[in-house]
Amino acid sequence: MLVTSPPLMPPVAVPASLDAFLAGIGPRAFRFAEAGLRQRDDALDAVQDAMERMLGYRERPAEEWTALFWSILRRRIIDLQRRRSFRLKFWVPQEDHDQDSTIDWADEAPGPAQTHEQQREYALLVQALRQLPARQREAFSLRVLQELDVATTAKAMGCSEGSVKTHLSRARDALQKQLEATR
């Protein structure tokens, strides 16, 4: 099931340069931003802004880049969400924003039936993630989907490690209930 703990990964080597770090984290950052913003263009803007801001921190030790980048990206996503809700609050009903979010499916290797099932399960997961409170969604995305450790997730979210564990536990419980209800 999708809400179980991921297998322990071997320690990731520290990238040799900031360019290599940004190139490696870009696709995951885009998926994270797209899940939070629900619009492809806004997600691309948020990731680009976060990468540009990271250039100002290139002198920091490479071990700090991961937590720093996710923290910058998370704050940028929150800023864009606030601006969008303020600007569009009076002009467009909120329901219309969810209708135009599309998902790209790049994996062509599996057969049609398997691809359809993966798409359905992913759509259910995305829908369930969108129903979570923001902090629980962030904790789940950073900890499980992005495979960050608890300390790095706590730094990125600006909270304690205990809060990360609490948010993650509640997110997993809620996701498991929602996903079991759809089966």
Can you annotate each of these PLM segments?
Residues 1-12, 16-18, 89-91, 155-156, ...:
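C-terminal edge and immediately downstream basic/flexible tail or linker adjoining helix-turn-helix-like DNA-binding
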Residues 130, 134-135, 146-163:
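Helix-turn-helix DNA-binding module
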Residues 2-31, 35, 41-44, 60-61:
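A short, charge-rich alpha-helical start-of-domain segment used by transcription regulators
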Residues 16, 98-127:
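Acidic, proline/glycine-rich intrinsically disordered inter-domain spacer in sigma factors
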